[in-house]
A protein has these predicted regions:
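Surface-exposed beta-strand edges and their flanking turn/coil or helix-capping segments
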Residues: 1, 25-27, 80, 90-92, ...
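Active-site C-terminal subdomain of aminotransferase-like
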Residues: 1-74, 78-80
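Alpha-helical scaffolding segments of alpha/beta enzyme cores, especially the outer helices
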Residues: 7, 49, 53-56, 87, ...
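A common structural junction motif
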Residues: 19-21, 93-100, 127-130
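Short amphipathic beta-strand starts and helix->beta connectors
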Residues: 58-64, 91-98
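Conserved PLP cofactor-binding pocket of PLP-dependent enzymes
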Residues: 69-70, 74, 96-111
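A C-terminal functional module that forms or caps the active site or interfaces directly
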Residues: 76-93, 100
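PLP-dependent enzyme catalytic core of the Aspartate aminotransferase-like
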Residues: 83, 87, 105-130
Length: 130
């Protein structure tokens, strides 16, 4: 149970939704997470390392204002105000790279089981370009 003022409760609701807490099918996601831990634990470490590598490249990019600390396979970042978000996303989409818009200027990239080493190298190369 969480108790707090309006600001805290609104923040908690936003985070819950961001993490999938508003989904009715949350049991399916929990089952997938359990399977991943049982069968792909070592692979999860690779995903986490790749996410950290993506974050490191983003931190060096002039287009990126900030990158949140990476603890899992999720990379969350904000663009500089002079970079049109739609143009940035469209450019990556043209290279078959999908980035989620989280709102409030935050963007999200996620590594996963089907994200290959070749895809990773390609992404890092594209993100490294000015």
């Amino acid at each position: 149970m969480l108790v707090g003022d309006d600001a805290l409760m609104n923040k908690a609701l936003r985070i819950r939704k961001m993490l999938g807490g508003g989904m009715r099918q949350i049991g399916s996601l929990a089952a997938a997470a359990s399977y991943a831990l049982d069968h792909h634990y070592d692979r999860l470490k690779e995903d986490h390392q790749k996410a950290k590598e993506i974050a490191a490249v983003l931190q060096q990019s002039e287009a990126v204002l900030s990158v949140e600390p990476v603890e899992t396979n999720i990379v969350i970042f904000k663009l500089n105000s002079n970079i049109p978000e739609a143009l940035f996303l469209d450019n990556l989409k043209a290279h078959n790279i999908l980035v989620s818009d989280m709102g409030s200027g935050k963007l999200r990239m996620v590594t996963h089981l089907d994200y290959t080493d070749a895809m990773h190298a390609n992404l890092l190369e594209i993100l490294s370009k000015p």
